[in-house]
């Protein structure tokens, strides 16, 4: 059985394919062990740590990520992988374990950065005003 899922964070979009296999996890066609920085790698593997590690040996996961920055992509991939595992195993206990650990594992974080406006250096900050 093949399961396709997706995850989003800021402008990053990850699409994951979960199928029966022997535990390969690939991010953009390269093994997850080669992902840098290590923090992003740990974040992507979180769903396997919460689910039992024997689950990792039963499935192959392929993730393609585009847009955003390094950590945004890691969060999007993490969500896509977690959703894929839940859909693939069809396990309510696993879903509850993910929700108890961190809701963003299964639910996209819809927050976006506010666009910059004129009259200041950022979205809300204004340029300093001088009276004399």
From Swiss-Prot:
GO BP terms in the entry: maturation of SSU-rRNA from tricistronic rRNA transcript (SSU-rRNA, 5.8S rRNA, LSU-rRNA); translation
Single GO term (MF): structural constituent of ribosome
GO cellular component, one term: cytosolic small ribosomal subunit
Keyword vocabulary terms for this entry: Ribonucleoprotein, Ribosomal protein
Positions of the UniProt region annotated as Disordered: 112-132
Matching Pfam families: Ribosomal_S9
NCBIfam families: PRK00474.1, uS9_arch
Protein family: Belongs to the universal ribosomal protein uS9 family.
The protein's name in its UniProt record: Small ribosomal subunit protein uS9
Phylogenetic placement of the source organism: Archaea, Methanobacteriati, Methanobacteriota, Stenosarchaea group, Halobacteria
